[in-house]
C-alpha cells in the first residue's frame, strides 16, 4: 500500500503559496509555474531513475513517530521500529543513494536507521548558526539545498517558512523520504489556512527559473541561503543578482562558497577540473568576493567563517560509496588538489540587501 507523502507535501506547498499571494503578488507567478516544475521532476524522459525514486518514497512504511528533533546535529525522528520496519526503511532509503548531505536518524535503539551521509552538514551549520541572528518568524529560501538537511535545521531554528530549491531529481526524492517521517512535526501552529500547515517545502528548480520582482515590497524572503553553489555558476555576478532579487529590502544573504587566499584582485579560474569537478568556474578570494557582493548592491558585507574542508567532514560512507575528498587531494600533499590547486577552503559571508 503506497503512502501519500508527496501528494500531501505538494498540496501543502500550493496552500502556502496561495496564502503568500494574498500579500505578495509575485507568489502568483510561482503558482503559475508550479504544475510544470512538479511535473518535470517526475518525468522519466528527463530522469530515467524518477519512477524508481518515486516508488521508494511511496513504499516507506507508516510508523508511529513520537518526536522529531530538528535542532539535533543528527536530524532525529524518534520512533520504535520493529526489526522488519528497520530493514524495510534501510532498503528503501538505500535506493535513494548516494546520500550527500545529512546526517539523519530514523528510530531509536537497536533498530534505528542511521543515514551516515558523505558530508557532516551539521558541522557547517554549527559554524554558521552563531552569526545568523534570529531566524524566528522569517521566510527563508535555501538555494541548492540538496537533500534538505539545512532547510530542516532552518525550520528548527524558528523560521516561519522555508522553501528549498534544487533541480536534482534525486535530492527532491531524498527530501520527500525524510518528509514522510517528519510529517506534521514542522507545522506552523500560527497558520490560519486550511491544510496541515507544513513550514518546510521543496521545489525542484534552479534559482534562474524563479520569478523575481524589482518592485519594492514584492519579494518573498527575509533570508536567502546559498551554500556550495556559486563556484558552479558560469556567471557569478548574474547569480548574485538573482539571489538579491529574491530578498526583501533589508533582507539577509548567507553565502558559503569556495575561496582562495589573496587580495581583492585574486580569482582562481581552474583550467580544466578542480578537485576532479569539471563544473567549477570561479574561486575568488574573500576580498574579491566582498567586492562582487558590493558591486551588485549588497551592503554590510562581512566574512564570518573560513574553514579548510577536512577528510573527516567530507568522506565516503556506506550511504555514499563513491570517491570523496580524500580522493580529490594530492596523496603526497593534502594542501593541494590532485590538479595542483589549493585544497578546498570555504568561507561564509553575510550581506544585507
From Swiss-Prot:
InterPro entries with a match to the protein in the record: CmoB, Mo5U34_MeTrfas-like, SAM-dependent_MTases_sf
Substrates-to-products reaction catalysed: carboxy-S-adenosyl-L-methionine + 5-hydroxyuridine(34) in tRNA = 5-carboxymethoxyuridine(34) in tRNA + S-adenosyl-L-homocysteine + H(+)
Record carries keyword tRNA processing: yes
Keyword tRNA processing: yes
MF terms in GO: transferase activity, transferring alkyl or aryl (other than methyl) groups
Binding site for carboxy-S-adenosyl-L-methionine: 101, 119, 124, 144, 166-168, 207-208, 227, 231, 346
Record EC number: 2.5.1.-
Lineage top rank: taxon: Bacteria
GO biological process terms, semicolon-separated: tRNA wobble uridine modification
Pfam family for this entry, one: Methyltransf_9
Keyword tags: Transferase, tRNA processing
Function comment: Catalyzes carboxymethyl transfer from carboxy-S-adenosyl-L-methionine (Cx-SAM) to 5-hydroxyuridine (ho5U) to form 5-carboxymethoxyuridine (cmo5U) at position 34 in tRNAs.
Family assignment from sequence similarity: Belongs to the class I-like SAM-binding methyltransferase superfamily. CmoB family.
Subunit-level organization: Homotetramer.
UniProt protein name: tRNA U34 carboxymethyltransferase
Organism of derivation: Psychrobacter sp. (strain PRwf-1)
Higher taxonomy: Bacteria, Pseudomonadati, Pseudomonadota, Gammaproteobacteria, Moraxellales
Amino acid at each position: 500500500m503506497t503512502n501519500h507523502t508527496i501528494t500531501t507535501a505538494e498540496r501543502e506547498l500550493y496552500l502556502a503559496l496561495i496564502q503568500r499571494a494574498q500579500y505578495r503578488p509575485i507568489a502568483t507567478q510561482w503558482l503559475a509555474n508550479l504544475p510544470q516544475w512538479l511535473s518535470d521532476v517526475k518525468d522519466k524522459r528527463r530522469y530515467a531513475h524518477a519512477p524508481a525514486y518515486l516508488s521508494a518514497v511511496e513504499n516507506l512504511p507508516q510508523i508511529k513517530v513520537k518526536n522529531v528533533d530538528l535542532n539535533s546535529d543528527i536530524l532525529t525522528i524518534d520512533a520504535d521500529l520493529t526489526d522488519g520496519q528497520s530493514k524495510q526503511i534501510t532498503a528503501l532509503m538505500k535506493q535513494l543513494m548516494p546520500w550527500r548531505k545529512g546526517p539523519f536518524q530514523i528510530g531509536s535503539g537497536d533498530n534505528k536507521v542511521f543515514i551516515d551521509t558523505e558530508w557532516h552538514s551539521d558541522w557547517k551549520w554549527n559554524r554558521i548558526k552563531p552569526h545568523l541572528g534570529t531566524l524566528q518568524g522569517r521566510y527563508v529560501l535555501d538555494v541548492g539545498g540538496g537533500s534538505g538537511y539545512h532547510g530542516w535545521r532552518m525550520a528548527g531554528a524558528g523560521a516561519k517558512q522555508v522553501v528549498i530549491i534544487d533541480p536534482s531529481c534525486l535530492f527532491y526524492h531524498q527530501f520527500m523520504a525524510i518528509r514522510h517521517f517528519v510529517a506534521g512535526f514542522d507545522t506552523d501552529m500560527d497558520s490560519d489556512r486550511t491544510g496541515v500547515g507544513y513550514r518546510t517545502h521543496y521545489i525542484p528548480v534552479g534559482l534562474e527559473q524563479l520569478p523575481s520582482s524589482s518592485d519594492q515590497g514584492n519579494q518573498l524572503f527575509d533570508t536567502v541561503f546559498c551554500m556550495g553553489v556559486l563556484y558552479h555558476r558560469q556567471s557569478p555576478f548574474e547569480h548574485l543578482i538573482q539571489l538579491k532579487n529574491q530578498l526583501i529590502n533589508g533582507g539577509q544573504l548567507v553565502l558559503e562558497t569556495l575561496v582562495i587566499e589573496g587580495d581583492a584582485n585574486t580569482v582562481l579560474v581552474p583550467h580544466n577540473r578542480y578537485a576532479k569537478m569539471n563544473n567549477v568556474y570561479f574561486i575568488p578570494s574573500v576580498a574579491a568576493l566582498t567586492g562582487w557582493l558590493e558591486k551588485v548592491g549588497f551592503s554590510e558585507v562581512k566574512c564570518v567563517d573560513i574553514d579548510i574542508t577536512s577528510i573527516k567532514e567530507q568522506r565516503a560512507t556506506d550511504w555514499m560509496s563513491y570517491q570523496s575528498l580524500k580522493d580529490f587531494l594530492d596523496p603526497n600533499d593534502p594542501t593541494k588538489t590532485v590538479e595542483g590547486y589549493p585544497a578546498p577552503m570555504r568561507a561564509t559571508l553575510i550581506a544585507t540587501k
